[in-house]
Amino acid sequence: MTVRISKPAFNLRDKLTELDFARVPYEKMPPQSIIQRKRYFRTSNLYTSSSNDTDVITGQIRPIFSSSQILIELAVTPYGGNTDTLSSRGRIRRGYGVGTASSGTQIMYNRRMFFRSGSALKAMCGQMVAMDEPHTTDILEYVFQVSVETTSGSSTVEFYADGYGVGAPENVMTIMEIRGNS
């Protein structure tokens, strides 16, 4: 006895076009994948000689997964106003919700972000990188702050929106959500 089996025609190309893969679902992305990225810039010039923390760049992100890590990359070009001795600190803070980062948790600190003795430049930090694990899907706000530690005379630390008039930002903060392992 012979048994014959017939199957309907199957066209792989048609089946693939039926799938909606314009974007890979976040849940299917492997650990350590970048889920989202946000960029923020200094949009006006800032001059400070304050020993209190002064906000330079602020940005927000809402993680999709509570297990995600948040990578904060900061690229800044601080200048020292006039030629007096100047030492300034930089820090990155995190707050939960919009408008909360200025007094939030410190996650990165650099005591000598900018240091000048007299008219000689001694040190300048152009980049700060921090990895945060906030364990939430609420809006997070990150802020880069600067404060003057010591100064002689009237030195200021300065950040420009466009220092040389070339139409390109000079100070930028990039915030990325990185998929966690769970």
Regions found by a protein language model. Give the residues of each.
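Terminal beta-strand-rich extracellular "head" domains
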Residues: F41-S51, R62-I139, V143-S182
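Secreted extracellular polysaccharide-interacting domains
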Residues: D53-D55
